[in-house]
Amino acid sequence: MNVLEQTEQKLKEQIHHAVIHAELATEDQVPDIILEKPKDKAHGDFATNIAMQLARVAKKAPRQIADDIASKLNKSEASVEKVEIAGPGFINFFMKQDFLGEVIDTVLSAGDNYGKSTGGNGEKVQVEFVSVNPTGDLHLGHARNAAFGDVLCNVFAAAGYEVEREYYINDAGNQINNLGLSVEARYLQEIGQDVDMPEDGYQGQAIIEIAKELVKKDGEKWADKDHEERLDFFKEYGLKASLRNIESDLKDFRVEFDHWFSERSLFKDGQIDDTLAVLDDGGYTFEKDGALWFKTTEFGDDKDRVLIKGDGNYTYLTPDIAYHKNKLDRGFDRIINVWGSDHHGYIPRMRAALQALGYPVEKFDVKIIQMVNLFEAGEKVKMSKRTGKAVSLRELMDEVGIDAVRYYFVARSNDSQLDFDMDLAKSQSNDNPVYYAQYAHARICTMLSQAKSKGFNTEAEFDASLLTAEKELDLLKKIGELPQMIVDAADKHTPHKVTQYIFELATLLHSFYNAEKVLDADNEARTHARIALMKAVRQTLANAMTIIGISAPEKM
């Protein structure tokens, strides 16, 4: 628990004591005390509505209760400078600021580990994300899915959870047959044959590149082979090449998976039959019109779902149910899927399946990723200028840089549509939040280099009590918030809060730096304190940037 958390906990304890001392409630009647941080600094450092919560028990007006609590509060023990009553009975606390200096020591001693905690208690969380069909390039929606999933995993890890990243390979459905036919057609075209693409073929540039690679490797070896033999080869070759390309693009995007799970393994190991047997034994299946159905309506779905079609083939739902059973059987405490917005309707049937299989449904969660709209020169970009197809992750990384793509794709909540302005993302100005944040880090690094060149000892002892300017105190409070912010982001699955935090801290840093002089030969003691503060801000920025997977440059 860091110094800010300790201060908050101490204040809660003293409020509790004041309630008892004022005889407003008994021990078992005191509700959980919730402290909020007012957006307006004029309302103090913390505020609580405890007086309103106690009105019925104490049989008094909330403002009178608030006055009673304020009069009985041990301000010294609570590190409170003053208390104000506002509105119908809110209590605003203005804290003594002397404790804030301890934040610097906390940050500098923890170094790269500052912000991390053990709050997750090693709980095992699996996050399955991206999982796009291996049939072409990764596009904008996949890229946002990748950024969100990866940063969510980083947040979980920083908050003390044991995290596993997984990619589910859809390698058993008809899309692999279409992939083989598509690669076959492109291969034959590359060697000069007049062949049309299959009706359901994949048109992307990635398939053309795979075919060119094969021609370079094998020449016309496959031109006269038996069609079935050739198609089997093209399916496997296309699958491996597509997965290799996807993995390469994701790795360059700084996203790496712990486990790549093959859908085919569910068929080979008999896991699908085992899953169907469990559903049948529970009385959750029935036959109608020659098909096998799942009674999902018993669990709140709007209609029952087909598991095995009349032709004997499985629906997409069946292996998906077996896959989720497999996940929970591996011992994860929680499984989280990151899906596109077109999968929203799939959630109720998967919840129904897990309930029917006997698993606690609260172990399963889905995060929906909304669309990305790309803009350039004020116009919406629908197609790539280079390929005439949808803009790929690879193109976007090459065009605007990995840092910018990752930052922007986790800058907003996953359930909000995202407008990505390519011109802004490439600009080196304070209007670009990525540049603005990274410049804050580089600015401190430059200042520290100047300090050394001017003869200041950047490792000198310092007196944090000299940091009394409002902008200094704002920085101290903000860097002290990092650990709890990470815990909250993990609890609420909101990695965009880390990006927001980075921007807010960078804003405070620039405001301070523009208003105050750090290196002052006439006030060496304060200079040493401010250097220490700048080092703590730099470390905090770097740690937060590591979580969202962007670089913290020393020069710009």
From Swiss-Prot:
Coiled coil regions, renumbered to chain: none
Keyword Flavoprotein recorded: no
GO molecular function, one term: arginine-tRNA ligase activity
Gene3D superfamilies: Arginyl tRNA synthetase N-terminal domain, HUPs, Isoleucyl-tRNA Synthetase, Domain 1
Signal found in the keyword field: no
Pfam families in the cross-refs: Arg_tRNA_synt_N, DALR_1, tRNA-synt_1d
Similarity comment text for this entry: Belongs to the class-I aminoacyl-tRNA synthetase family.
Main location: cytoplasm
One GO-annotated biological process of the protein: arginyl-tRNA aminoacylation
Protein name per the record: Arginine--tRNA ligase
Domain of life: Bacteria
Any single Gene Ontology cellular-component annotation: cytoplasm
InterPro entries reported for this sequence: aa-tRNA-synth_I_CS, Arg-tRNA-ligase, Arg-tRNA-synth_N, Arg-tRNA-synth_N_sf, ArgRS_core, DALR_anticod-bd, Rossmann-like_a/b/a_fold, tRNAsynth_Ia_anticodon-bd
Annotated catalysed reactions: tRNA(Arg) + L-arginine + ATP = L-arginyl-tRNA(Arg) + AMP + diphosphate
Keywords annotated in UniProt: Aminoacyl-tRNA synthetase, ATP-binding, Cytoplasm, Ligase, Nucleotide-binding, Protein biosynthesis
SUBUNIT field: Monomer.
Subcellular location, record wording: Cytoplasm
Enzyme Commission (EC) number: 6.1.1.19
CDD domains named in the record: Anticodon_Ia_Arg, ArgRS_core
